[in-house]
């Protein structure tokens, strides 16, 4: 229902807007500041603004509506529409006012919520067909086996051994026994899905009654288990295979035979084996491993080549002083490798000639 609301100036007005033609939604008040002028004018969240100071909001964007509200200085006239009647009382809580909604509609309640069959008072039970040994409780008709209305049921004497028979004949009917100074109510239907053994429940009930009467409880003998030497037991155990020996691989068996067939006079112990680099003769056309010109072993990795001869980097030394000739000049004299000083000493020119060292061009 459209309503006209006037808020006295100046700003702030105390409410928040949302929507606009740019959002394809009407201008709606989303929040009211407690204690503000909007709350005093009884504005509520959810009110749709139809006009601001006489200007319709059908074609207003959100920014235009904010500008129109900011332009109002002395008072702000709003035309609002409320879909339903809202009660917005100013309730003060700890000095702050908070508008709230009140739903006056009563919620339906199930009248049968508190009526459940398990909440009824247990009724006493008597063994049908038994006429002696136990007296008949008040409120029980022995001839028909049906219970009659009675406020209090009492039992003068009770036979604990007959409880199992009574409970098994009517497992869903509660048993109520009033003994001197104690009252025992047994409702077997409270055990969900028969999770507990019926025999255990009966033994417990019989023990309680016997203890209350001052008698020694007589427990039934446990059911004998299946003998372990039955036909099925023997059939299952006779078909089992004997434990087989662990399986060994073919290589292990060959080594085991060699060890068993070997002579016993060989000395026992360990020996140190030093790995030796072997030169494998490759097939024709395959690249062979280079041999060191000094030590004669194969070269794996870095190699130094001088005049078609290969050496290890640590073997590339002078034959006299063992000076490493890497990054230095080297000389071959009679097939041996020397440094410059020892090469001059071993090479003496004829008389009248001087020794001149010639270095290859880079």
From Swiss-Prot:
GO molecular function, one term: actin binding
Keywords assigned by UniProt, alphabetized: Cytoplasm, LIM domain, Metal-binding, Phosphoprotein, Zinc
TM regions (residue ranges): none
Gene3D superfamilies, sorted: 2.30.42.10, Cysteine Rich Protein
Modified sites of kind Phosphoserine: 18, 92, 263
Domain LIM zinc-binding: 290-349
Protein localization: Cytoplasm, Myofibril, Sarcomere, Z line
A family per Pfam: PDZ
Any one GO cellular component localisation term in the record: stress fiber
Region (Disordered): 261-282
CDD domains documented for this protein: LIM_ALP (cd09450), PDZ_PDLIM-like (cd06753)
The UniProt record lists the keyword Zinc: yes
PDZ domain segment(s): 1-84
Quaternary structure and interacting proteins, as annotated: Interacts with ACTN2. Forms a heterodimer with PDLIM4 (via LIM domain).
Name assigned to this protein: PDZ and LIM domain protein 3
